[in-house]
Amino acid sequence: MSAADVEYRVRHQAFWFVACLAVLVAQIIAEYLMGRVPICACGYVKLWEGGVNTSGNSQHLSDWYTPSHIIHGFLFYGLGYLILRRKPLAARLLLALMIESGWELLENSPLIIDRYRTATMALDYYGDSILNSAMDTVFMCLGFFFAARAPVALTVVIAIFFEIFTGYVIRDNLTLNVLMLIWPVEAIKVWQGGL
């Protein structure tokens, strides 16, 4: 590869990464305009919020739902690989970021917040802080980059481990969250409420 080819490739990748950063910034601005709180109303930021049905859940840097966002990264890497195989990795990341950011905006809309509160165990859920939502997107990116480098089998094993572990500890995970959001099962809601 010539020096000119390398320079072109670096500039091309830089374009895609700047576009990725722009999506994250747009997500943050949109959530601010939606009236989301920047950080936890408690006034401080924690690295980890271990409570599930607490006022601090979905308000700090990470929580029990962080593994779900890492799994999003695994899944979105796979999707990008399938439909954008010939595009640079950063272009596939842009697709993943657009999906994740779109989900974060939808998740923090009154429609989905109300749905969570009526159909799932998240009775006191009032939406994510902007910081938590942005970090959810960053964790998705970490999952994406992990999936891009790790063997598929390892990525699948880690996803299964995350699902089983969080399901056991907090009685919720990505699979249950999606199920309860789309097609609530009363028996699961009762089981989750027993935590």
From Swiss-Prot:
InterPro entries: DUF2585. The chain crosses the membrane at residues 14-34, 64-84, 128-148, 150-170. It comes from the Bacteria. Its main location: membrane. Belongs to the UPF0314 family. One of its GO terms (cellular component) is plasma membrane. It holds the Pfam family DUF2585. This is UPF0314 protein RHE_CH03951. Keywords: Cell membrane, Membrane, Transmembrane, Transmembrane helix. It is a multi-pass membrane protein. It is found in: Cell membrane.
